[in-house]
């Protein structure tokens, strides 16, 4: 694995949703670095990628309430333990659970293993509320997938908050877990 600046030079074998991610970041003037890798399906693999990226790789959890009427994307450091009961109480929601894959595709155009804050660019009707753990906000860089789990990127957390989220018309709620 090798850290590279910006978008891939050759994009013929890349999915359109990945290219749209790079297009968005480039349009916003967000500097980012990228590493290509085998599919990252576990946090253990992500931790190896983290060593190359030198960024906080987040657990990105796609959650919903019992009625499947409210949807949340939670970003927490990979080192934190997640308890649905605690988060549900903090945001005043009925007990949260993991969302069905079809909602991931419908709202974020992503599949399990590729969940990313950058998927919010596809949520044009704001079905998903972003929740960010305070420790993620304290990190200089955030690491995430460009809507596909065979690449990972890092960029300044401040760019996420100040450029990316406003551009995709999403705000966030800070949580302490």
Task: Enumerate the predicted regions with their spans.
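Extended, low-hydrophobicity, polar/charged segments
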Residues: 1-177
């Amino acid at each position: 694995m090798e850290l590279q600046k910006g978008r891939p030079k050759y994009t013929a074998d890349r999915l359109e949703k990945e290219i749209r991610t790079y297009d968005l970041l480039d349009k916003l003037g967000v500097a980012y670095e990228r590493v290509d890798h085998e599919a990252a399906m576990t946090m253990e693999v992500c931790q190896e990628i983290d060593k190359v990226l030198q960024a906080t790789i987040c657990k990105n959890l796609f959650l919903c309430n019992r009625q499947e009427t409210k949807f949340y994307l939670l970003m927490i450091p990979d080192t934190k333990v997640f308890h649905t009961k605690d988060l549900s109480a903090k945001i005043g929601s009925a007990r949260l659970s993991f969302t069905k894959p079809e909602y991931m595709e419908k709202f974020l155009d992503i599949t399990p293993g590729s969940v990313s804050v950058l998927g919010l660019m596809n949520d044009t009707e704001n079905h998903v509320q972003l929740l960010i753990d305070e420790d993620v906000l304290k990190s200089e860089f955030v690491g995430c997938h460009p809507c596909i789990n065979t690449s990972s990127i890092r960029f300044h957390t401040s760019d996420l908050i100040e450029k990316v989220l406003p551009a995709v018309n999403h705000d966030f709620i800070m949580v302490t877990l």
